[in-house]
Each structure stands twice: as C-alpha cells, then as structure tokens.
Amino acid sequence: WICIKTCRTDGSNRAKHSRQIIHMGNPFQTDTIRIVTVSGRIASGSTTLAKELARELGWKHIEGGEIFWEAVRKRLALNPKETNLRPDEEDILFDKQLTAILQNERELILETKLAGFNAQGVEGIFKILVICEDEHGNDQTQIRIDRLANRDHNSVHDAKEEVLEREKNDLDKWRKLYAHEDPNWTYYDKTYYDLVI
C-alpha cells in the first residue's frame, strides 16, 4: 500500500487536492530490480512518490538532482532558476556519477529528472515517470506552480518564474548535451519509462 497525494482540476481550473491510498500489488519483482528511478517535471509529485516508495520498500532514497544542483548553485552563487548558467562540465560530471550509481547500487530509489533517461539499457532498473496532466494529456502547469509555491512557501509569482524559467533552461541545456539540439526532445517522454503515474 502506498499513500499518494493527487491533484486535478475541476471545470474552473482550480486545483483539487486529495490523498489516495493505492494498493500497488506487486508492480515489479524486487528480486530482479536493483534500483527504481523516479523522474518528473518540477513539482509533479516525484519527490513525494520517491520518499513513499523508499519508506515502503525499506530502500535508500537519493534525491540526486537536488543534491547535485544545490551544491553547484551555492558554489557558483546562482539562484534556483539559473540552470542555464551551470557549466556543461558540471552536468557531464553528474552524469558520470549517476551512471556509476545506476550500474552498481542496489535497493535504491533514485530521484532525478534525468534518471529514467540515463537508465536506458541498464539491467535491473525500473523507471517511473510522475506526471501532472489532465485527462487529455496536457501538462497542468498552474497546479505545479501552486504546489511549488505551497511546498517552498514562495509567492505564486516566484514559483511561476522558477517553474517556467528553470524548465526552459534545463531543457535547452539537456537538448544541447543529449539530443543534438532536437527541439522536440524531453526527458519526460513516456517511452523512456516502465510506469507512468
């Protein structure tokens, strides 16, 4: 059993939040899975899911992107949305560390935006994508902005700026590094994942 906080919009586009208990049954065999990756767009609920999975399975949880980004951000004196100012070498170094974790660790819930993408072809990895979409598959950006504002106790304006700028900056950087500048590439492409929640 796992408890997940869900949100959706009603007809007026206001967020309706609820907690839902979901019986996961046996979504994967833990004897063949060494690592579960959890990825999602900013404030989609990926951290909540990763923490709950780690607690439920008794596995270690690493929030890799935040640990990495916070250290780099502080060292370079950048604000949270200035991911475009992070040197490419920092991303490449992080990818090497992430690859080593994906190849060697066990009983780990690894949460980073690129974890599912980077885990392609690695044995023993179960890749989860957390989305915040309406019934038509459209991203619910305003809900994610509201979630970020509530979670970090920021103004809605600051949260909106962070979500929109940081996502754009991340995608621009990663498209350059990993997708030959393909303007359609995203790390949240559902084909990279074993399960989409």
Model-found features: residue ranges?
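ATP-dependent small-molecule kinase phosphotransfer cores
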Residues: 63-123, 138-142, 146, 153-162, ...
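Post-Walker A helix-loop "phosphate-sensing" segment adjacent to the P-loop in P-loop NTPases
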Residues: 55-62
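Short glycine-/polar-rich loops that comprise or flank the Walker A/P-loop
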Residues: 122-126, 191-194
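Phosphate-binding P-loop
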Residues: 26-32
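Glycine-rich phosphate-binding P-loop
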Residues: 38-51
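Pre-Walker A (Motif I) flank of P-loop NTPase domains
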Residues: 32-35, 106
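Small-molecule kinase domains that catalyze NTP-dependent phosphoryl transfer to phosphate-bearing small molecules
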Residues: 154-197
